[in-house]
Swiss-Prot record:
Keywords: Cell membrane, Differentiation, Glycoprotein, Membrane, Signal, Transmembrane, Transmembrane helix. GO terms for biological process: cell differentiation; negative regulation of cell-matrix adhesion; positive regulation of cell migration; wound healing, spreading of epidermal cells. The gene is PLET1. This is Placenta-expressed transcript 1 protein. It is a single-pass type I membrane protein. Residues 162-209 are annotated as: Disordered. N-glycosylated. It is found in: Membrane; Apical cell membrane.
Length: 242
C-alpha cells in the first residue's frame, strides 16, 4: 500500500497540472468577454478597408480614426448569416470571435488591424463591425460591408445623350441674329429740280474761228481801199473846182 500511495501521489500531481494547463483553462484570454456598458451607432463612417471587395482566403487591412479618450478597439467580422468568421492578427484579447486591441496613450490616432478571410465559397457578403471603447466601457459602433466579387452594380452613363432635368426654368436665350441682315427701306428723295440743259449748241455758243478770221481780213482789206477812194474822190472834186 505504501508503494501504491507513493506511485499515486506523483500521478495525481501530474493530473492536476494537466488540468490546469488544458486548452479549456489555458485560454482565459479567449473566454474573458468584457461586456459593453452601452453601445451607440456613429453617425458618420470613418472606416477604410483594403481591398474593398470580399474574396476568400485574403488578408485585409482595416483602419479607422480613433478619437481622444478611446482606450481599446473591438473588431468582428460577420457573414450574411451573422456568423463570426475569419481571424484577426495579434489581438490583445479575444472572445467569441471578437478581437480587442488595447491602445497605448489617450490621444487621437489612426488605428490599423489585419483580418484574414476564411477559405470558403459560401460567403457572399461580410460586415466588419468596429467598436471604439472608452474607459467606462461605453462603445460606439461603426460598420462597413464588403460585397462579393461580381455583385457590385456599376451604372453606365450613355455617351450618346445625357438628359438633365434642372430644378429651375432657365432663362430664355436672346434670339440669334439672322444670317442675312435686313435691308433698310429708307429711300433718299431725289431732287426734282434739274439743271436746265443748254439750248445753244456748241457750234452756236462758240463761233468758228474761220468766220472771225475772214471778217478781220475783209476789214483790213477794205480800210485802205476806202481811204484810197476817198482821196481819189477829193482829188477829182478839187480838179473840177479849180
Amino acid at each position: 500500500m505504501a508503494i501504491l500511495r507513493s506511485l499515486l501521489l506523483p500521478l495525481g500531481l501530474l493530473l492536476c497540472l494537466w488540468l490546469l494547463c488544458s486548452p479549456a483553462s489555458c485560454t482565459n484570454s479567449t473566454t474573458n468577454c468584457k461586456p459593453f456598458l452601452s453601445v451607440t451607432t456613429k453617425k458618420s463612417s470613418l472606416i477604410h478597408i483594403s481591398p474593398d471587395i470580399y474574396k476568400s482566403n485574403t488578408l485585409y487591412t482595416v483602419s479607422t480614426q480613433v478619437s481622444h479618450g478611446i482606450i481599446s478597439v473591438v473588431l468582428e467580422a460577420r457573414d450574411q448569416n451573422k456568423s463570426v468568421i475569419g481571424s484577426w492578427e495579434n489581438p490583445s484579447d479575444h472572445c467569441e470571435g471578437r478581437a480587442e486591441y488595447y491602445l497605448k496613450g489617450n490621444f487621437s490616432t489612426l488605428f490599423k488591424a489585419k483580418w484574414m478571410s476564411p477559405n470558403s465559397t459560401d460567403i457572399t457578403t461580410v460586415k466588419i463591425n468596429i467598436y471604439t471603447v472608452n474607459s467606462l466601457r461605453n462603445a460606439e459602433l461603426d460598420s462597413i460591408t464588403l460585397p462579393e466579387v461580381g455583385t457590385v452594380t456599376v451604372k453606365h452613363v450613355s455617351t450618346k445623350q445625357v438628359i438633365t432635368t434642372p430644378t429651375h426654368k432657365p432663362t430664355p436665350a436672346p434670339p440669334k441674329p439672322t444670317t442675312n441682315p435686313q435691308k433698310t427701306t429708307t429711300n433718299h428723295s431725289i431732287p426734282t429740280t434739274s439743271l436746265p440743259k443748254p439750248t445753244t449748241s456748241l457750234y452756236t455758243s462758240h463761233p468758228k474761228l474761220t468766220t472771225t478770221h475772214k471778217s478781220s481780213a475783209n476789214r483790213a482789206f477794205l480800210c485802205p481801199v476806202r481811204e484810197a477812194i476817198q482821196i481819189l474822190f477829193i482829188f477829182l472834186i478839187g480838179t473840177l473846182l479849180f
